[in-house]
């Protein structure tokens, strides 16, 4: 219950049911994913994915609201994402994806990740804390540069149809997804540059068909 206790200590505005349930259930998938490796180590690969599914199933059976089930299972699924940050420098696009994937749960994900540090090794604990401080600072900088919490492609659906000369259909969704990825990779782009990239993508699609 150490993670739960540490999560509760981070609550600034009173009890947070979503955070507390996520702290309780974040490692629920470990027993099902436990493997003994040849070198003697024990692994729990993908326990966050398995745990998210188990969380959804159990909370649904307990008659929690659909919204609460969705949020808690999402936090369980994302609780390991930060650990990739400490092993190598993330690009700005990776930070954008982290924020996008967390969505309105970002603040709770911050707290859950910090509370999941249970090591007694003070040097390791301090290193993790510094790494997370660094990630939060980068997120804050990017949010100042662009409204990261409301990322949209540089062109909307009507502009896409106008530029490509096509009507509504599945291709608009595909183009929108392409432009969103472009936005995540490069940040804000001028309309002319976005239109040029869209035309280049469209030409490649037609060449492949």
Positions of PLM-derived features:
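Divalent metal-dependent catalytic cores for phosphoryl transfer on phosphate-bearing substrates
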Residues: 3, 7-127, 131
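Charged substrate- and nucleic-acid-binding regions of tRNA-handling and nucleotidyl-transfer enzymes
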Residues: 57, 61, 119-209
């Amino acid at each position: 219950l150490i993670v739960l206790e540490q999560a509760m200590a981070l609550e600034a505005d009173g009890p947070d049911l979503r955070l507390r349930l996520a702290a309780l259930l974040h490692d629920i998938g470990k027993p099902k994913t436990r493997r003994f490796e040849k070198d003697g180590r024990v692994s729990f690969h993908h326990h966050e994915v398995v745990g998210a599914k188990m969380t959804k199933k159990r909370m649904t059976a307990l008659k929690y609201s659909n919204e609460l089930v969705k949020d808690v299972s999402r936090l369980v699924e994302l609780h390991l994402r930060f650990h990739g940050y400490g092993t190598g420098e993330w690009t700005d696009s990776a930070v954008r994806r982290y924020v996008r994937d967390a969505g309105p749960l970002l603040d709770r994900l911050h707290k859950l990740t910090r509370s999941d540090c249970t090591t007694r090794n003070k040097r390791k604990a301090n290193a993790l804390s510094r790494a997370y401080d660094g990630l939060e600072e980068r997120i804050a900088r990017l949010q100042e540069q662009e409204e990261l919490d409301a990322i949209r492609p540089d062109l909307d659906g009507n502009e896409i149809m106008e530029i490509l000369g096509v009507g509504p259909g599945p291709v608009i969704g595909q183009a929108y997804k392409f432009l969103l990825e472009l936005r995540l990779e490069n940040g804000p782009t001028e309309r002319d540059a976005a239109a040029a990239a869209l035309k280049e993508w469209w030409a490649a699609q037609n060449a492949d068909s």
